[in-house]
Amino acid sequence: MTDRQFKLHGGQRGSALAVRVTPRASRNEIVEVLDDGTIKVRLATPPADNEANEALINFLAEILGVPKSQLEIVAGEVGRDKLVSVVDMDVETAHQRILAHLG
């Protein structure tokens, strides 16, 4: 990643997660949380036809225990580095749920 410093961010209606996606993995998993706060995720789906983005939303919804409608990729739809908005979940709750699912 570049010199950007991503962290879990709190907002009025929820939080935002910086995510780095590796498609075509053997399974869906959270690999690690990088020093800059970016969540490294492996997905089994290919990046074609928006499949990886859909898989990411489905996977994060499962991990965070929220409906898919509460998640949105707000930046990075065509790249590996993404910013995902999580509505109605505070930063601390999101952080704890992600750490509980580290590979």
Describe the role of every protein-language-model region:
Residues 1-58, 72-77, 83-103:
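Contiguous, often N-terminal, cationic amphipathic patches that form binding interfaces
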